[in-house]
UniProtKB/Swiss-Prot annotation:
Record-annotated active site: S237, D344, H393
GO CC terms: extracellular region
Entry keywords, A to Z: Glycoprotein, Hydrolase, Secreted, Serine esterase, Signal, Wnt signaling pathway
Gene that specifies this protein: notum1a
Sugar-modified residues: N101
Catalytic activity line of the entry: [Wnt protein]-O-(9Z)-hexadecenoyl-L-serine + H2O = [Wnt protein]-L-serine + (9Z)-hexadecenoate + H(+)
Function: Carboxylesterase that acts as a key negative regulator of the Wnt signaling pathway. Acts by specifically mediating depalmitoleoylation of WNT proteins. Serine palmitoleoylation of WNT proteins is required for efficient binding to frizzled receptors.
UniProt-recorded name of the protein: Palmitoleoyl-protein carboxylesterase notum1a
Phylogenetic classification of the source organism: Eukaryota, Metazoa, Chordata, Craniata, Vertebrata
Subcellular location: Secreted
Family: Belongs to the pectinacetylesterase family. Notum subfamily.
InterPro entries the record matches: PAE/NOTUM
């Protein structure tokens, strides 16, 4: 009875706060203030099943531990009712800021920077590292500068940027992090966020990825990060690898500056690469065809690359190993959540498997299946991870990031469960929340055997394909594959259709 009364009191005061905020906003508009700004469509009712409270007021969840789901449903509905008020004054765009330390630059010497959307009252910060491959010698860096200058220079960066997926400010697109402070760091160092060498007369390009991250964190301290409770360092592709390389150093930097109460965590998306043998070995002449190990061996010298100290000690003299997730992960001290497609397109590209619409040879099929198996094996001891059996690359900034599921759980739900499990751990509660999985990996063995995978389109016609059409299109032999698996072809087709 006391708990129910407490919940109702919290909701009562929150509603009163909402009415005051709405009333004040309406009064300002009635008095003839600024012209009302056009605003985006409000979130659908579906958000009520997926949203989460903002951080405008503090809640003691331990008081309703036994009835948490019911309590959260009420608070989610409250957040939905609050949203129309806040939407009228919400600024969705992140704004460009250049680093105060102008000696830390992009490849071409232009100033590095970041995009920021502040969320007043929130003590959660999401710092995102952009991806975009790399270059590892003067020749392919020159080529990259001619064809992809945005990834090496800030000279034409726009003044604002709108976040998508997990960087979105819309609760229907980003149910658990929409009200966080959002930071997007553009990738302009071409060094997998590892470099620490400036541009000089001898060096045509600066490689300062690791320094850019540190300078952004320093600059953000004066913009509210000093009061943060949680800092989530996230990234996709090269940015995902950058998370693995930098999450501990970010935490150590904050501790050195006296901010010991900020919990630093990592979220690595599509950055868990394997140093496996290529399907077809080629000379290391460009970024795409060069074997992953050879790229990093050459790149780490060219960039003046820095790796985490514990990993450096584990692989002294062979520090290139630290760029591969399954090798660096055991040395990382901070909690990191891994998001990885089991059939990652970038991994297949560097392994010289090019799915361009031509029928895939039998040897390529075996290689692709083995890749999924290898990835599963490297992820089996990772406690917090989400690995769908899909053919894709990058995830958390896609607009479909809430739709893909593994074993009935979406990525936003898994991340929320992870967040809760870390909170419980900090309270010395060793057991994870019931019905809240954080170790999610598909077991089906083919690309796109999960029916919730992103849509595949025929490259020649643009038409959508289901998984069976896709596999047939790529030369998949149902009879032969069923025979290899020791099952009836119709049963195999049923499994592919259901994703089992």
């Amino acid at each position: 009875m006391k708990r129910s009364l407490w919940v109702m009191q919290v909701l009562h005061w929150a509603v009163m706060l909402a009415l005051v905020q709405c009333g004040a906003l309406g009064a300002r508009r009635f008095r003839g203030g600024r012209n009302p700004q056009p605003r985006r469509a409000l979130p659908s009712a579906h958000y009520r099943d997926r949203g989460e409270t903002t951080e405008s007021f503090s809640l003691d969840f331990t008081a309703v531990e036994e009835n948490m789901d019911n309590f959260m449903t009420q608070v989610k509905n409250l957040a939905q009712s609050l949203y129309p008020c806040s939407a009228q004054k919400l600024d969705y765009d992140m704004k460009l800021h250049f680093l105060e330390n102008t000696s830390v630059t992009c490849n071409d010497g232009t100033p590095a920077g970041y995009y920021l959307k502040e969320s007043k009252g929130s003590k959660r910060w999401l710092i995102f590292l952009e991806g975009g491959w790399y270059c590892f010698n003067k020749e392919n860096c020159d080529s990259r500068y001619e064809t992809m200058r945005r990834l090496m220079s800030s000279s034409k960066w726009p003044q604002t940027k709108t976040g998508t997926g997990m960087l979105s400010s819309l609760p229907e697109e980003n149910p658990h992090w929409w009200n966080a402070n959002m930071v997007f760091i553009p990738y302009c160092s071409s060094d997998v966020w590892s470099g620490a060498s400036p541009k000089t007369d001898q060096n045509d390009y600066a490689f300062m990825g690791s320094l850019i991250i540190k300078e952004v964190v320093k600059d953000l301290l004066s913009k509210g990060l000093d009061n943060a409770k949680i800092l989530l360092l996230a990234g996709s592709s090269a940015g995902g690898t950058g998370v693995l390389l930098n999450v501990d150093s970010v935490s150590e930097l904050l501790e050195e500056l006296g901010h010991t109460n900020i919990q630093v965590r990592g979220l690595s998306d599509s950055g868990w690469f394997l140093d496996n043998k290529q399907y077809r070995c080629t000379d290391c002449v460009d970024t795409i065809n060069c074997a992953p190990t050879e790229v990093i061996k050459r790149g780490i010298k060219y960039w003046g690359g820095v790796v985490p100290e514990r990993c450096r000690q584990a692989y002294e003299g062979k520090e290139w190993n630290c760029f591969f997730g399954y090798k660096v992960y055991p040395t990382i001290k901070r909690p990191v959540f891994i998001v990885q497609w089991l059939f990652d397109e970038a991994q297949l590209t560097v392994d010289n498997i090019h799915l361009t619409g031509q029928p895939v040879q039998e040897g390529q099929w075996r290689y692709i299946q083995n890749l999924g198996t290898e990835l599963r094996n490297t992820l089996k001891d990772v406690p917090a991870m989400f690995a769908p059996a899909c053919l894709s690359h990058e995830f958390i900034t896609r607009n479909y990031w809430t739709d893909v599921q593994v074993k009935g759980t979406s990525l936003p739900r898994a991340l929320h469960c992870w967040d809760r499990s870390l909170q419980d751990t900090s309270r010395n509660n060793k057991s994870p929340p019931k019905g809240c999985p954080v170790h999610l990996i598909d077991s089906c063995p083919w690309p796109h055997c999960n029916p919730t995978c992103p849509t595949i389109r025929d490259q020649s016609t643009g038409q959508e394909m289901n998984v069976i059409q896709f596999l047939m299109h790529m030369g998949f032999d149902v009879q032969k594959m069923a025979h290899q698996q020791g099952m009836d072809p119709s049963k195999l087709l049923g499994m592919l259709s259901s994703g089992s």
